[in-house]
């Protein structure tokens, strides 16, 4: 019996974590042909990272293609693309080795674009600078605000970037720029990103692209000519690949000009 791809990717992850950080290349591939538009990934991510109402790390965009009577509804989940040339980092005013956002080169998160909530000044320049709309400023709202008591599930801390962040009052990350980070706090503990684990249709692949034995590397190799990235013309070199669409430009209305 063939292994569930989650089992395979879990084994790949355990192997990847034993490799030197500089030899790993975390990547994600999303096969939109399998997406049922259930948004389980969106909700699981919001729960994992304690996101405010209406603000998402991984929205699922939907569009219609074709003409009546041959119409088709297609979907595109959009996490942060973890660009190798991230425009958001370039426009951040808090620079330097102890800056607010950067392209990580060391440790578990090597290759990811993280945010240091303690250094972020909430200016929003990175939000405007991301052409994919993958960042937002935490608006400080709660789902149960206006009720007699905020529910505990909203005020317990998240564990992004390996630290505890109690999202209460004006505590960080309220007011900070926020974004997807491939759930590096989970990866550091040997778990796959929450969006990958929660996908009931198994449309997401994650792992070390540099490991030829990993499932994601093999899927990328087998489908190389068919793979697409969002706004390739920008030269940002995203680490999130899409399979199953022939033209991603139909989703451009969701992106910044």
Please provide the spans of the model-predicted regions.
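Non-ligating segments of multi-cofactor redox enzymes
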Residues: 1-257
């Amino acid at each position: 019996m063939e292994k569930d791809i989650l089992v395979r990717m879990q084994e790949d992850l355990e192997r990847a974590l034993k490799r030197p950080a500089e030899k790993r290349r975390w990547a994600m591939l999303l096969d939109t042909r399998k997406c049922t538009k259930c948004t389980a990934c969106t909700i699981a991510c919001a729960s994992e990272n304690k996101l405010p109402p209406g603000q998402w790390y991984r929205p699922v965009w939907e569009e219609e293609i074709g003409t009546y009577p041959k119409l088709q509804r297609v979907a595109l989940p959009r996490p942060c693309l973890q660009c190798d040339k991230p425009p958001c980092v370039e426009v951040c005013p808090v620079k330097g080795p102890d800056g607010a956002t950067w392209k990580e080169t060391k440790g578990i998160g090597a290759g990811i674009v993280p945010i240091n909530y303690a250094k972020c000044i909430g200016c929003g320049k990175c939000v405007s600078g991301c052409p994919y709309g993958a960042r937002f400023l935490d608006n400080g709202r709660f789902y149960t605000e206006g009720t007699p008591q905020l529910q505990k599930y909203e005020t317990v801390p998240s564990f992004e970037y390996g630290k505890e962040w109690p999202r209460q009052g004006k505590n960080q990350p309220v007011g900070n720029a926020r974004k997807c980070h491939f759930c590096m706090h989970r990866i550091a503990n040997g778990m796959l990103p929450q969006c990958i684990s929660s996908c009931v249709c198994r449309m997401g692949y994650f792992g070390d692209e540099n490991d030829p034995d990993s499932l994601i590397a093999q899927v990328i190799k087998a489908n190389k000519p068919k793979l697409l990235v969002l706004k390739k013309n920008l030269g940002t070199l995203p680490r999130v690949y899409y399979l199953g669409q022939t033209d991603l430009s139909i989703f451009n209305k969701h992106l910044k000009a």
